[in-house]
């Protein structure tokens, strides 16, 4: 659920910022520019996912029962980083900046597919699993709080 929330909020904020920059005529190098090079926001998503992956390895590698709070934070971070990466899916698929061109639609399609998978996992899967167990006569065990 937290990954879905992080994904949705980040997607809305990112699309909002890029739309404002585009409408104000920021040009091809609008946004974050370091040393004359435009840094696309998917770079921050990739770095974030690398850090999260390493953190998950550390959490699983050294503790039998890692703190649930850390998993909540990392789930949110996963959603945030995924939104940053998939918002520019068309860029790394076409190897050129097509964000505002027709091919930019590929990013929207990737976002919808991934968002649907996250929503399914957060909302529909637990319900479907409970219904399945109910009809098979095997109730689900109580979840620890």
Q: What are the functions of these language-model segments?
A:
Residues 8, 44-53, 111-123:
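Hydrophobic cores of alpha-helical transmembrane segments in multi-pass inner/ER membrane proteins
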Residues 90-104:
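Interfacial helix-loop-helix junctions of multi-pass membrane proteins
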Residues 1-5, 71-72, 106-110:
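Alpha-helical transmembrane segments and their helix-start/interface "positive-inside/aromatic belt" motifs
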Residues 114-145:
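Primarily interfacial, aromatic-capped hydrophobic alpha-helices that serve as membrane anchors
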Residues 56-72:
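Helix-coil boundary and interhelical linker segments in multi-pass alpha-helical membrane proteins
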Residues 31-42, 102-110:
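Short aromatic-rich membrane-water interface segments that cap or initiate transmembrane helices
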Residues 7-23, 80-87, 122:
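Alpha-helical transmembrane segments of multi-pass membrane proteins
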């Amino acid at each position: 659920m937290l990954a879905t929330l992080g994904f949705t909020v980040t997607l809305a904020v990112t699309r909002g910022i890029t739309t404002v920059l585009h409408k104000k005529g920021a040009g091809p190098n609008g946004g974050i520019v370091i040393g004359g090079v435009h840094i696309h926001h998917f770079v921050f998503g990739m770095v974030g996912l690398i850090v999260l992956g390493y953190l998950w390895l550390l959490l699983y590698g050294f503790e039998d029962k890692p703190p649930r709070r850390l998993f909540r934070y990392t789930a949110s971070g996963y959603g945030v980083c995924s939104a940053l990466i998939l918002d520019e899916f068309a860029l790394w698929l076409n190897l050129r900046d097509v964000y505002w061109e027709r091919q930019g639609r590929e990013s929207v399609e990737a976002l919808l597919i991934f968002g649907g998978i996250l929503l399914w996992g957060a909302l529909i899967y637990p319900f479907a699993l409970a219904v399945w167990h109910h009809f098979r006569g095997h109730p689900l065990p109580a979840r620890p709080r």
